[in-house]
Amino acid sequence: MKKVFLLYILFIELIFGGCQNEDNSANTIGEHKNVPDYTPSSEDVVDMHGEIKNKERFEVFLNNVEKGNNDSIRVVRYTEEGDPMLHDLEYDGEVIKSTTDTRRDKFGAGSISNATCTSAEIVETTERTEYVLEGCDNTIDNIILVTWK
């Protein structure tokens, strides 16, 4: 009887052991190979869950765009889990080149998207102020930054 019971346990272990997947995709969601580490810069505008750091630098960028002066800036938004999502904006005196890099978001799809936009606008509501890109050649999330009132 003991031998039958041990054979039964061994059989069950083989069945469950054979069903295991070594890849375990739950642990690889959002992992992207060959993504360089993000190194923060004192020039970055940082949105940490609604708390904006270095907003003055962002306002200088908007002012330069309005005046037609070349400028570039990086806006970094952090996810709830603390992953940085980078949004690089480069103004060449005519258009704003937007590059959004979400590859470091462990729970997102992770991609790099590019767009060329004609302007940056300020949209005021009673609850918040949105800074958005306008006249973009690609369908993108055109919100650069949001400040809450």
Predicted feature descriptions by range:
Residues M1-V4:
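Positively charged n-region of N-terminal signal peptides that target proteins for export
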